[in-house]
């Protein structure tokens, strides 16, 4: 059973983070970046996928909180919503990055090594 190239996967994850943060810095230079968050570890019963990455900025978080308050009439205070949404990469999807073909190939190598006989 082939083993994944863990160093290559780690390097890919690092490069995705660097590229995403640089992209947001270029496109939204006035915004304050506070995090790059991997999320959506996903398998569709056929394939395992590389996680998505969202970049969190204070300004994006403020927009997401406002959206939640306006659309859902949240009973939580603004501070409580900020706290609960700050680390939710899926809610910060406006600044979402995909790993592309390289990420999917890396995920497939992990899937093949972990359970080659699995019915995904």
List PLM regions with ranges.
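Short, flexible coil/linker segments at or flanking structured domains
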Residues: 21-26, 41, 75, 80
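Low-complexity intrinsically disordered segments
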Residues: 2, 75-120
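Short N-terminal edge-element motif at the start of the domain
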Residues: 1-37
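Non-transmembrane, interaction-prone segments in cytosolic or luminal domains
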Residues: 16-20, 24, 48, 53-55, ...
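Generic structural motif recognizing short loop/turn segments at the entrances and edges of beta-strands
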Residues: 5, 29-34, 46-51, 81-93
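N-terminal interaction modules that seed assembly of large macromolecular complexes
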Residues: 27-68
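The catalytic "switch" region of P-loop NTPases
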Residues: 68-74
């Amino acid at each position: 059973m082939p083993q994944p190239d863990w160093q290559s996967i780690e390097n890919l994850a690092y490069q995705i983070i660097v590229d995403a943060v640089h992209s947001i810095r270029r496109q939204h230079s006035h915004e304050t970046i506070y995090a790059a968050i991997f999320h959506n570890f996903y398998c569709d019963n056929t394939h395992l996928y590389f996680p998505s990455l969202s970049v969190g900025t204070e300004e994006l978080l403020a927009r997401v909180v406002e959206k939640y308050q306006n659309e859902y009439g949240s009973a939580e205070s603004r501070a409580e919503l900020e706290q609960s949404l700050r680390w939710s990469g899926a809610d910060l999807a406006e600044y979402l990055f995909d790993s592309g073909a390289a990420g999917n190939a890396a995920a497939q190598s992990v899937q093949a090594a972990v359970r080659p006989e699995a019915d995904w």
